[in-house]
């Protein structure tokens, strides 16, 4: 039986290996890519700095080594004593890699686990303890060291994972055959980095299973489609609401299903909701700049909404980079001395000040960014599949390696999960826009500088934003650190409200009140320090959505009106929601 397995396994392994080399063109496209060379250069320089400081601080190194050796001996002694399974070190809370009871109860695997965890902790603590390394270099070394350490976790290998070994023996290796088949398919559908499947990509259809709230596309240009949602109440608030999603993701994270759709909930509260659905760019859109998302994006959407509804002002909300675009739009209006067209602005997990980028900062380096720019310019865009893997590796154990083990080594089929489907439905970013984000915003933090960013021929200034603003961030957000978003809020003028939700970048925002799952913190006084603000904040139960809705109602006339007509003479209905742009999947077919 095993002879037959090994024969099949070797055939599939050869097929997968051939596909890998063919699709990735490893020799020339990956190994010799500008980005790979830049990463090697940066890692070499960082390692040299690390060794230099380690050589200059032998006492600190020896102290940690002595502690490691003492604890390692204790692990030896504990596992050598029959029945004594006392744990010297445990996995951190939330780390599910070693949840199988064999890691705790079987001496050999307990030893492997504890030795690995102890080495990992000692190595990272050693880097952290070294003086003389600048903060950015230290953060980068720790980040990439952590990537290597977690990639080499004993949980990722059959021989050192008791659960995998037992499963493979019980199934006569069929799990590995099934896993290789999935690996081959993922290699075929990946870009230059292996994108591990998180969910069944055939389980959902955009417009049928997700993004199902009824509406109509009333405008389309090269950049976006504008969706006008159909009302769910007899009367509606007089001021329409425009939502600006990030152009690095698809909008329907805010309209997954009826039970968790923010769009549907807002309609139920009487808001007239309009949504921008960004195009998934290909090489033909390489020229699209960040400023175009303002002048050809939000500005065009606002004009369309004004004509359709007959209202002179709207409320607007932006999510993540969509919020950055929205803030830039409001500042653009101010710089052009135009009439106030946006009555209030809401920012979900939005960075305006990029001085605290979080773990994304590991990639924010002139050498690395220059290499990415070279690749973007040659290709015309940043491939969304690679971008998706980059974000997954910010939480590598829970968003990458666990799926690697589950899919390829256990041979399990990915589950059907709407949120993970959206997360896997990646979108490209045009070369010009991605280059701008990395260099002008993340690296040089120009958005908060005087005459730092010019859009549509004018310098924009966030301090000129005088409309009421509502900032909501989440405490566990690892993509847009809430301390960083808080700093951005301080750069704007006007009345400001800052709210801190529980959970992370997605779950903390998509937090339907009916679930009563996550609460939030509120403090009406914006202190200079984010931590000081939090120390004086009051925790509230329930979703921040209800608080935001109460805030939005302030910027609506007291009396509601009849629902607005769908489209207008100049903005006729083109298509039913969700439109066509959101259905573009990667790789984008060039027309």
Model-derived features: positions:
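Short beta-strand/loop motif that positions the catalytic acidic residue
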Residues: 465, 471-473, 477
């Amino acid at each position: 039986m095993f002879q037959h397995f090994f024969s099949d396994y070797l055939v599939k392994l050869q097929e997968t290996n051939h596909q890998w080399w063919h699709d990735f063109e490893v020799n020339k496209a990956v190994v010799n890519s500008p980005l790979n060379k830049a990463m090697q250069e940066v890692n070499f320089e960082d390692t040299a700095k690390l060794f230099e400081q380690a050589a200059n601080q032998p006492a600190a190194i020896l102290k940690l080594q002595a502690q490691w050796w003492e604890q390692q001996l204790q692990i030896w002694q504990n596992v050598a004593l029959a029945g004594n399974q006392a744990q010297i070190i445990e996995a951190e809370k939330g780390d599910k890699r070693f949840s199988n009871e064999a890691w705790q109860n079987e001496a050999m695997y307990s030893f492997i686990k504890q030795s690995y965890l102890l080495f990992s902790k000692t190595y990272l603590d050693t880097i952290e303890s070294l003086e003389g390394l600048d903060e950015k270099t230290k953060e980068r070394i720790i980040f990439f060291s952590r990537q290597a350490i977690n990639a080499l976790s004993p949980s990722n290998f059959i021989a050192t994972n008791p659960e995998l070994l037992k499963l493979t023996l019980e199934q006569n290796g069929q799990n590995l055959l099934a896993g290789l088949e999935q690996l081959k398919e993922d290699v075929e559908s990946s870009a230059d980095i292996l994108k591990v499947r998180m969910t069944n990509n055939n389980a959902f259809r955009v417009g049928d299973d997700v993004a199902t709230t009824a509406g109509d596309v009333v405008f389309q240009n090269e950049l976006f489609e504008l969706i006008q949602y159909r009302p769910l109440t007899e009367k509606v608030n007089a001021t329409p609401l425009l939502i600006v999603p990030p152009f690095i993701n698809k909008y329907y994270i805010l309209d997954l299903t009826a039970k968790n759709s923010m769009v549907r909930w807002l309609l139920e509260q009487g808001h007239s909701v309009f949504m921008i659905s960004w195009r998934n760019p290909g090489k033909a859109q390489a020229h699209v700049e960040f400023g175009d998302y303002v002048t050809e994006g939000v500005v065009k959407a606002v004009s369309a909404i004004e004509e359709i509804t007959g209202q002179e002002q709207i409320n607007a909300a932006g999510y993540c980079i969509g919020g950055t675009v929205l803030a830039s739009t409001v500042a653009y209006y101010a710089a052009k001395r135009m009439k106030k067209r946006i009555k209030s602005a809401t920012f979900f997990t939005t960075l305006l000040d990029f001085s605290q980028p979080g773990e994304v900062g590991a990639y924010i380096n002139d050498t690395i960014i220059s290499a990415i720019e070279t690749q973007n310019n040659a290709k015309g865009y940043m491939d969304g599949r690679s971008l998706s893997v980059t974000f997954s590796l910010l939480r590598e154990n829970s968003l990458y390696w666990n799926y690697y083990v589950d899919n390829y080594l256990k041979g399990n089929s990915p589950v059907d999960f709407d949120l993970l489907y959206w997360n896997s439905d990646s979108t490209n970013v045009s070369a010009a826009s991605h280059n701008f984000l990395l260099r002008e915003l993340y690296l040089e933090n120009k958005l908060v500088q005087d005459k730092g960013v010019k859009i549509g021929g004018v310098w924009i200034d966030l301090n000129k934003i005088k409309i009421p603003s509502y900032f909501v961030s989440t405490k566990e957000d690892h993509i847009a650190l809430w301390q960083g978003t808080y700093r951005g809020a301080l750069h704007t003028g006007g009345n400001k409200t800052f709210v801190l939700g529980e959970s992370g970048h997605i779950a903390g925002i998509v937090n339907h009140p009916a679930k009563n799952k996550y609460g939030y913190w509120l403090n009406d006084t914006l202190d200079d320090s984010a931590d000081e603000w939090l120390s004086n904040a009051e925790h509230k139960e329930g979703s921040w959505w209800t608080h935001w809705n109460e805030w939005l109602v302030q910027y609506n006339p007291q009396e509601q009106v009849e629902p607005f007509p769908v489209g207008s003479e100049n903005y006729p209905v083109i298509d039913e929601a969700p439109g066509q742009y959101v259905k573009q999947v990667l790789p984008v077919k060039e027309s």
